[in-house]
Amino acid sequence: NGERSRADDYRAQGSLLMEYEILKGLSISVSGMLDFTQGNLNQFRPSTLDPQFNENYSKGGMLRKISLLTEELLRYNTSIREKHNIELLLGLSVSKDQEFSMQGSGRRSGSDYVYYYPVQVEGGIHNYGTATSPRYRPLTTYESNFKEKTMVSYFGRIGYNYKRRYLVEFTYRQDGSSTFGENHRWAKFPSIALGWAFSEESFIKKWTERWLSWGKVRASYGTSGQIFDDAYLAHGIVKMEGGSFNGVTLAEPGENIAPELTWEKTKQYDIGLDMDMFDNRVGLKFDYYYKYTDGLLYSVSLPGDIYYNSTQMQNALEVSNEGIEFDVQADIFRESAVKWRTKFNVSRNWNRFEKSANGRDIGNLIQGRPVNAFNVYVDDGYFQNEDEVPRYYNMQGDEKYLSNDRLITISAKTGYSNLVGTPKIMDLNGDGVINNKDRMFYGTSLPMAHGGWANEISWKNFDLNVLFNITLSRQMRNNNAWTLTQGNPVFVDLRGVSFWSKEGDNTTYGRIGTYAESLRSQIEKVNSVSLKQITLGYNLPKQFVKKIRLSEARVFVTGENIFYWSNYSGGNPEVISVYTGVDDGGQYPLPQKWTIGLTLNF
């Protein structure tokens, strides 16, 4: 059809490291890193694809990003009598990120065969109306944007262990970022970690030496910070999008200035256990963590009319996360010709919305409930006739039907509620109105457990790697299926699907033309297993590799997203966001991908 689009991406990375040993155990290092990326885009649409104005259209854009990082480290390591091991570290880090973008467009070029807009048409605007009723539109547009942010960090670490049996480490860092207001740029983040290699204790060895190779318990506490992506959110943003006056473009505030914005801070506690057993054939790892994050950004409504915008970004929310992680690794066959190592991990996370700035719930964020919660209406089939539709009486004694988020309802005297064939939603508080007060908590989109199973098998020059993903008891809402009752559904397999049409029907969905969302009946408890990746490789014989002056050569074939099994009524649940758990039919399915490769080492 003549439409063209071209994208070119470029990237260059470079790093430099210099290290010098001043004294035995004392060294200094200086490093630098540069990361440059640029993307160019050009799009062209010929005049034949513009039925209204018969104009061709060309658009071009460029996005350039530059990241610079320099880091200076002073290290000191020493051991006293091979018992007391000490490690000291002091560091300074400076980073700068720049982003520059520009784009422009042009219309009414001289030819549909020139894909780039050559020169600006004289005048720059065109009247698409008449002399008496003009309607002007620019023939060319241009916009550009520049962002820059800088961060400076000072940090230090002190580590000590006795015979590598008792371990303690203290870390402290102070970070400053240009993204915050002048009085809130700096933040302090201390942390401490403790460890005990209990397997080295003589009183434990005599009970465990036959099966325990190594074991350690560990605990830590630390704080960390997060900056927001927008470089100027705290300083206020001015947009050149306010229209024009007398031919001059106007500027307007994009966001209210927020000089009190500061770091999102997280306090985290960890307890862990590491064990290797049976001559290091089996390894176990267990972790428990608790994280509390405050100062999360949220757009807060402002009182009165004195502000240009009615909202302001503030550090307004607090959220907690708690979880466990378990890993096991085992060498099933280690000394035989066939070697097989298997790894299994499983994790569980709980989160909770702890607090808002004003102490109130925010939409689906209910204090004390999970962040990823489903707050739904309770439904029980469909209204089969008018007698099933609840009736209420107002203050004047008039009989009314059940209302949908309205106090003014259809009079019951007409005998027609327009609710027959629609979901029978429970009025939980009995006020005659279906609204958010009738919602109930019905689980979370976070799975009860999520894990993976990896296998590494080798025989002679062949190797096989297989990875499975497993998800258990994940709540999901199949919103996509309910679009079938609307006039513009996302088309799915209609076999076995039925719609309510008359009294007594026991159908999959209500009558055509109705739609209800956030219903309990839409929630499904989903389990799934997927073969995510399988790789078969072959290492060429060493004699042959040496003849062609290589140190190693390997050919392999890899498959991704091979298959999945799930009890979900929709498509592959892996593409549904774990944060929302809502399937709206807009997710692109995971492609099955096969790769053939060759690895050469010189």
Where are these regions (language model features)?
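C-terminal beta-signal and terminal closure region of outer-membrane beta-barrel proteins
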Residues: A316-N321, N364-E388, D493-R495, G504-D505, ...
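Surface-exposed loop/turn segments flanking beta-strands in extracellular/periplasmic regions
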Residues: N1, Q43-S58, F100-T141, A234-I257, ...
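Short loop/turn motifs that connect adjacent beta-strands in outer-membrane beta-barrel proteins
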Residues: L23-G25, S79-I86, R165, S199-G215, ...
